Protein backbone atom coordinates (compact mmCIF):
# COMPACT_ATOMS: atom_id res chain seq x y z
CA UNK A 1 0.00 0.00 0.00
CA UNK A 2 1.51 3.33 -0.99
CA UNK A 3 1.87 6.30 1.36
CA UNK A 4 -0.96 8.34 -0.17
CA UNK A 5 -3.38 5.41 0.22
CA UNK A 6 -2.34 4.86 3.85
CA UNK A 7 -2.95 8.52 4.64
CA UNK A 8 -6.36 8.44 2.92
CA UNK A 9 -7.37 5.39 4.97
CA UNK A 10 -6.21 7.02 8.21
CA UNK A 11 -8.08 10.25 7.38
CA UNK A 12 -11.21 8.19 6.68
CA UNK A 13 -10.88 6.29 9.95
CA UNK A 14 -10.24 9.38 12.09
CA UNK A 15 -12.99 11.37 10.34
CA UNK A 16 -15.50 8.61 11.03
CA UNK A 17 -14.50 8.54 14.69
CA UNK A 18 -14.71 12.33 15.03
CA UNK A 19 -18.06 12.71 13.23
CA UNK A 20 -19.68 9.88 15.16
CA UNK A 21 -18.57 11.45 18.43
CA UNK A 22 -19.36 15.07 17.56
CA UNK A 23 -22.47 14.54 15.41
CA UNK A 24 -26.01 14.96 16.61
CA UNK A 25 -28.02 11.85 17.13
CA UNK A 26 -30.81 12.73 14.66
CA UNK A 27 -28.83 11.47 11.66
CA UNK A 28 -26.16 8.90 10.89
CA UNK A 29 -23.09 10.27 9.12
CA UNK A 30 -21.02 7.56 7.45
CA UNK A 31 -17.59 8.31 5.98
CA UNK A 32 -17.56 6.42 2.68
CA UNK A 33 -13.98 7.24 1.67
CA UNK A 34 -11.36 9.97 1.50
CA UNK A 35 -9.08 11.11 -1.29
CA UNK A 36 -5.91 13.21 -1.19
CA UNK A 37 -4.32 15.30 -3.90
CA UNK A 38 -0.93 14.01 -5.14
CA UNK A 39 0.88 16.83 -3.28
CA UNK A 40 -1.04 15.97 -0.07
CA UNK A 41 -2.22 19.57 0.38
CA UNK A 42 -5.93 18.83 -0.03
CA UNK A 43 -8.15 15.96 1.05
CA UNK A 44 -11.82 15.37 0.35
CA UNK A 45 -13.88 13.32 2.76
CA UNK A 46 -16.95 11.73 1.16
CA UNK A 47 -19.92 11.07 3.43
CA UNK A 48 -23.34 9.47 3.23
CA UNK A 49 -26.18 10.50 5.53
CA UNK A 50 -29.23 8.64 6.82
CA UNK A 51 -32.02 9.61 6.77
CA UNK A 52 -31.58 11.29 3.40
CA UNK A 53 -33.74 14.29 4.36
CA UNK A 54 -31.06 15.25 6.95
CA UNK A 55 -28.30 15.28 4.32
CA UNK A 56 -28.06 19.06 3.87
CA UNK A 57 -28.02 19.73 7.62
CA UNK A 58 -25.40 17.02 8.22
CA UNK A 59 -23.17 18.33 5.42
CA UNK A 60 -23.37 21.87 6.82
CA UNK A 61 -22.52 20.53 10.29
CA UNK A 62 -19.53 18.57 8.98
CA UNK A 63 -18.23 21.59 7.05
CA UNK A 64 -18.56 23.79 10.15
CA UNK A 65 -16.50 21.26 12.12
CA UNK A 66 -13.67 21.05 9.55
CA UNK A 67 -11.24 23.04 11.69
CA UNK A 68 -11.84 20.86 14.74
CA UNK A 69 -11.64 17.73 12.58
CA UNK A 70 -8.31 18.86 11.14
CA UNK A 71 -7.00 19.42 14.68
CA UNK A 72 -8.21 15.96 15.72
CA UNK A 73 -6.47 14.39 12.72
CA UNK A 74 -3.28 16.36 13.40
CA UNK A 75 -3.25 15.13 17.00
CA UNK A 76 -3.82 11.49 16.02
CA UNK A 77 -1.86 11.08 12.79
CA UNK A 78 1.95 11.03 12.70
CA UNK A 79 2.59 13.18 9.60
CA UNK A 80 4.13 16.63 9.38
CA UNK A 81 1.57 18.28 7.12
CA UNK A 82 -2.16 17.72 7.48
CA UNK A 83 -4.03 18.45 4.25
CA UNK A 84 -6.76 21.09 4.01
CA UNK A 85 -10.05 19.20 4.37
CA UNK A 86 -13.15 19.44 2.24
CA UNK A 87 -16.29 17.43 2.84
CA UNK A 88 -18.74 16.29 0.16
CA UNK A 89 -21.68 13.95 -0.26
CA UNK A 90 -20.64 10.66 -1.85
CA UNK A 91 -22.67 10.84 -5.07
CA UNK A 92 -21.42 7.45 -6.26
CA UNK A 93 -23.03 5.75 -3.27
CA UNK A 94 -26.16 7.87 -3.66
CA UNK A 95 -26.48 6.85 -7.32
CA UNK A 96 -25.92 3.19 -6.44
CA UNK A 97 -28.78 3.38 -3.93
CA UNK A 98 -31.07 4.91 -6.59
CA UNK A 99 -30.21 2.14 -9.04
CA UNK A 100 -30.89 -0.51 -6.39
CA UNK A 101 -34.26 1.08 -5.65
CA UNK A 102 -35.18 1.22 -9.35
CA UNK A 103 -34.23 -2.43 -9.80
CA UNK A 104 -36.32 -3.46 -6.81
CA UNK A 105 -39.36 -1.57 -8.11
CA UNK A 106 -39.20 -2.89 -11.67
Model-predicted segments: where are they?
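Charge-rich, low-complexity N-terminal segments
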Residues: 1-106
Amino acid sequence: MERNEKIENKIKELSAEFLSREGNKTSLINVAHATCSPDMKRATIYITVLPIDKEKTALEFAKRKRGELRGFIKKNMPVKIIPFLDIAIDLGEKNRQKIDELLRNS
